Amino acid sequence: PVCVDGFTVKASDIDVNLHVNNTRYVEWAYNTFPLDYHKDYLLKVVEINFLAEGKEGNSLKVERYHLSECEDTVVIKRLDDQKELCKVNFEWQPVK
């Protein structure tokens, strides 16, 4: 991976069903890109696969893989069992 981050799920990340709110996964994935990246590339497509539920107190790892100039995949895993909770695919368009 070209970027790795880790943190613990907090109460503010949880929805009414006591699972991680789906929007949080997108935020966590998006935040693996530095602000300067967005000066050179515009987001074109986001595809999200929700694979398992995260809960408060889970320790998570976020890994970004650079697949090509305009394509990246971010995988969010639960640390205790390495279960993939979510995969987010980003397609970018260079700024002209």
Where are these regions (language model features)?
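A conserved acidic, glycine/proline-rich C-terminal tail/linker
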Residues: 36-73
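Broad hydrophobic/π-residue packing in well-ordered secondary structure
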Residues: 24-28, 50, 74
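Hot-dog-fold acyl-thioester-processing enzymes
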Residues: 1-42
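Detector for Asparagine
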Residues: 17, 21-22, 31, 49, ...
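HotDog/MaoC-like acyl-thioester-processing domains
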Residues: 1, 54-56, 65-96
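Generic structural detector for well-ordered beta-strands
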Residues: 6-10, 49, 91
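Well-ordered beta-strand positions in beta-sheet-rich domains
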Residues: 4-6, 45, 87-89
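A generic structural micro-environment signature
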Residues: 15, 20, 26, 54-56, ...
